[in-house]
């Protein structure tokens, strides 16, 4: 059964992303990122982007977790990720698993971080989760799911299965998890309720929805992701799960923010307009570093989406993964 389409016009987005991405990275996003890359470019100008939602046929049933794709699938991986022959080194014994956000996919979300970590010698892996059959983005000519839609608890279970695949392929005892937005929050559910604490060494969240947000905040993602406005109130169970006061968030709040033995880093931006107030992203616990991007780069205008492409934020991620070799993170 088809779902009535919602038309939307994005509000003007301030000139933030160009100063954050840099010309080379922005060009790469445009060439490789398809629709989301084009949205990032539009957000970096004073133009008011408008979009007409594509015709999307949604299934009658509520979305459920997608099956993990087999090796050699046609779903695009970001540069540097999903080399299943990669073996961790003594310098970086924990593979890094990248977890994208709501309305996103592994390819577009991690165009910047994945190749950076690969160049530093990490084994890097990235999954797509929470997808709905038939809901895809094809602006780049690749099969790009619109992910992060399914029930958050099922997506966390899907993350757990992917971690098991990575550990089996690499021989690693544990992994490090790096997530953006919803992808920064899901590891917490996996650790708290699905036995992930024994399999994870570090968790790094970029603008994570750790304690929920408002549906109004989630709608502010729509200008960046063509078709998202159609999905917020139809196929996006994760949107409702991330709302403050949801049953999912009540369960998350019923236990402490963190589990023993895992090191957490939260990287937030004062300009976050999606997960608000931004300090609600912070975690409480003795094993937590809560970091504000502008403390390292006061002039950074990176907001909720751009933080995943901010050179300063990515430097902070690298420091969190390898604190013994951390270096000062400045602008640029």
Predicted regions and their residues:
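Secretory targeting and sorting signals
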Residues: 1-42
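Extracellular/periplasmic catalytic domains that process cell-envelope and extracellular macromolecules
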Residues: 88-92, 117-119, 169-170, 178-179, ...
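Hydrophobic/aromatic beta-strand patches that form the interior of the parallel beta-sheet core
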Residues: 97, 125, 204, 265-267, ...
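C-terminal catalytic-base region of ester-bond hydrolases, centering on the histidine
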Residues: 225, 259-332
């Amino acid at each position: 059964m088809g779902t009535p389409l919602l038309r939307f016009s994005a509000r003007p987005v301030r000139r933030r992303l160009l100063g954050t991405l840099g010309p080379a990275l922005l060009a790469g996003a445009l060439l490789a990122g398809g629709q989301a890359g084009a949205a990032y470019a539009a957000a970096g100008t004073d133009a008011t982007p408008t979009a007409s939602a594509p015709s999307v046929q949604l299934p009658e049933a509520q979305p459920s977790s997608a099956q993990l794709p087999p090796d050699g699938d046609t779903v695009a991986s970001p540069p540097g990720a999903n080399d299943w022959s990669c073996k961790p080194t003594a310098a970086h014994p924990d593979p890094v698993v990248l977890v994208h956000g709501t309305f996103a996919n592994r390819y577009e979300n991690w165009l910047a971080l994945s190749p950076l970590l690969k160049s530093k010698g990490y084994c890097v892996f990235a999954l797509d989760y929470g997808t709905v059959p038939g809901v895809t983005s094809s602006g780049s000519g690749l099969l790009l799911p619109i992910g992060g839609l399914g029930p958050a608890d099922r997506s966390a279970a899907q993350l757990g299965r992917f971690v098991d695949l990575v550990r089996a392929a690499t021989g690693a005892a544990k992994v490090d998890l790096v997530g953006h937005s919803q992808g920064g929050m899901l590891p917490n559910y996996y650790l708290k309720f699905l036995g992930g604490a024994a399999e994870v060494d570090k968790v790094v969240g970029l603008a994570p929805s750790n304690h929920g947000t408002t549906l109004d905040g989630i709608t502010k993602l729509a200008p960046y992701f063509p078709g998202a406005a159609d999905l917020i109130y139809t196929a996006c169970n994760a949107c409702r799960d991330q709302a403050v006061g949801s049953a999912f968030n009540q369960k998350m709040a019923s236990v402490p923010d963190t589990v023993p033995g895992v090191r957490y880093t939260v990287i937030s931006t004062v300009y976050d307009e999606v997960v608000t107030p931004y300090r609600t992203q912070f975690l409480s616990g003795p094993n937590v570093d809560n970091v504000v991007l502008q403390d390292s780069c006061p002039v950074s205008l990176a907001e909720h989406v751009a933080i995943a492409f901010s050179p300063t934020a990515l430097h902070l991620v690298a420091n969190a993964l390898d604190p013994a070799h951390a270096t000062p993170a400045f602008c640029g």
